Structure formats: structure tokens, C-alpha cells
Amino acid sequence: TLMPYGRSCRCRSRGCWEAYAGGWALGERARQAARTDPEAGAALIERAGAVESITGRTVHEAYDEGDPLAARLVDATAEYLGLGLASVVNALNPERVVLGGGVIEGHPPYVDEARRIVRAQALRPAADGVEIVASELEGRAGTIGAATMAWAQHEGRHTTQETA
């Protein structure tokens, strides 16, 4: 949880990190901003065709073209990503964090911003000892993870059968 009693999440809880730093959440915040101020959201609405069609990808594309609303939304998402990651680094003290998924793939500078925020917000020993990198698996992480789990489960059965 990033914000107790915060934004509603797809998991039906509130305040989840994903509800602030996920791609779907970026799109939701953009749609809300465009509905509240259609003039500020004009570039997003035009790009998407309608307010309800605005997605995280729409925001990243508008950001790349210098849209001020998209810049504010992307900056906020980067901050949420970094703050949540700082909490993870404080709690687990990992040697490496690999960031992936649609938000990271849609806007690679998130990784640099996450590093900056972790360095500023996490406990010094943990922050100094962690490497934060972007995944090289792109959209294949889930498939590779599932295949790895299946292989490991098969190998476990195979090993057990040999030793029995």
C-alpha cells in the first residue's frame, strides 16, 4: 500500500502501489484530468479520439510531444513508482531490482527517475547497495516466468522419481 485509503485498485483494495504507478492508473488519472479540464486535456483527447479512450500509452505519446498535462501525469507516476520502490528497498534490501511492464516499456526514463528517488528516500545503506535496471524481457516476462516455473516443477518431480 502506497497511500492508506487512497485510490481504488483493480484488486478491490485501496491505495495500492499499482493504483498510482501502473499504466492503467496513469490512463485513469489522465481521463479524470481531461474530464475536469478539457482544455488542458485537449492534446490527449485529440490523440485518443475521446476522453474514455485515453490510455497510459496515449499519455506517453503526448509526453514525448511536450504536452504539459502529460508531463505532469508522467512526473507524478514516476514519483509514485520511486516512492513505492524506496519502501521495497528499505524492507527487503535487495541487491538488484528489475523493473518491467507496460509503464517502463512505454517510458524508459521511469527507471532513471526511480533510481533518483530511491537514492533520495531509501535508507542510505540499502539505497547505496541496490542496482535498479530495466527488464530486457519486454512483454515476454510472464511467459518466460510461467515456462520457468513449469520446468522447475517438472525437474523437481524428475529428481524425486530418480531418488525414490
What are these regions (language model features)?
Residues P4-A164:
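ATP-binding/phosphotransfer module of carbohydrate and carboxylate kinases, centering on a glycine-rich
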